[in-house]
Regions:
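Conserved beta-strand/loop scaffold segments within soluble protein domains that form the structured core
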Residues: 133-135, 139, 143-147, 151-318
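A generic structural signal for ordered alpha-helices
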Residues: 15-20, 29-40, 60, 173, ...
Length: 318
């Protein structure tokens, strides 16, 4: 029998992603992880009291847990050298023209505004620890679809019913006790998107959030929470990248997806990380009776990747 020809996979061309901007952040916490740092992040985020308490309890859990030993070694990752919150020198806007030129240039090089115009129902763009742009098409919003920054929704800025949804669902699928970096996420999370698709609504074109980590030696801890109600459907796309530095960067995002009865959700991810990145990501979906969940994931680069996806088939025929 003839020997099968071997196929070799070369490194992905990262020239599109390795450009970097001069650091112009408005505020950053000190490196490391302490109760004071967690409190400062909570103040910066204007958290409701329940979230402030949640963060500190997550920090307590983090301090009690060991580094996971079920994957590649991450012994070289030193949290004392990681900056867990970096606020860019801007605010979130629904108008692309209001985004600062240097940040706008970053996302334009990545093709985000072009993609929004051509084929997306809405876009969120996060730069370091904060969303800088978030917008959804009027016809999608008219269907009752909520696509917003998670923090604003948590504070009730889009309606108290959505604030209550977040309090009911936040880190209930991925709990701080799952593993050490889930606890870390619970303590210092910042940014991310909230999506609610009402009963029976079909979002015909995708929503997308893109996360760009620019600051060297920093971490990014966005949280994505999606609720697709009974009989509804959605395709959500997530993109992530960062330039290459000579110091470690950390990405420990979290995704929680709730798919209702006879609902359908497709979650697509493309991550292209530099070789100095520790990518420690946890994603989980819970599917009700007759619901359908589709994961499409492509993760490239990084120094170490822990990707921890899970689907909980809670209902019959899911």
């Amino acid at each position: 029998m003839a020997e099968k020809e071997k196929t070799y996979v070369q490194d992905v061309d990262r020239s599109l992603y390795d450009f970097r901007n001069e650091e112009k952040d408005a505020y950053r916490v000190k490196s490391g992880l302490t109760s004071d740092i967690v409190e400062k992040i909570s103040e910066e985020k204007n958290d409701p009291e329940w979230m402030r308490i949640f963060r500190h309890k997550a920090l307590e859990t983090y301090n009690k847990m060991e580094i996971p030993d079920w994957g590649p070694s991450i012994d070289e990752l030193d949290m004392d050298n990681i900056v867990t919150y970096v606020r860019p020198n801007t605010h979130m806007s629904a108008k692309w023209s209001e985004v600062p030129e240097d940040i706008k240039d970053t996302f334009e090089k990545l093709g985000i505004p072009q993609a929004e115009r051509k084929s997306l129902a809405g876009v969120g763009a996060q730069y370091d620890s904060e969303l800088v742009y978030h917008n959804v098409r009027e016809e999608v919003a008219a269907q009752g679809v909520i696509y917003s920054d998670l923090e604003g929704a948590m504070r009730g800025e889009y309606g108290e019913q959505y604030a209550e949804m977040i309090r009911t669902h936040f880190m209930k699928l991925v709990t701080p006790g799952d593993h050490k970096f889930a606890a870390l996420h619970g303590a210092v999370w910042s940014g991310g998107s909230f999506v609610y698709v009402p009963k029976g609504v079909s979002v015909e074109i995708p929503l997308q959030s893109y996360f760009r980590l620019n600051a060297p030696g920093a971490g990014q801890f966005e949280h994505t929470l999606i609720i697709v109600d009974e009989g509804a459907s959605l395709h959500f796309i997530e993109g992530c990248s960062a330039p290459k530095y000579n110091v470690a960067n950390l990405h420990a995002g979290c995704v929680e997806l709730f798919v209702g009865k006879n609902a359908k959700l497709r979650y697509s991810t493309i991550e292209n990380w530099s070789k100095n990145m520790y990518n420690l990501n946890t994603k989980r979906a819970q599917i009700a009776e007759g619901g359908v969940m589709e994961w499409v994931s492509g993760s490239f680069g990084s120094h170490v990747s822990y990707l921890y996806p899970m689907t909980v088939l809670k209902g019959d025929n899911s």
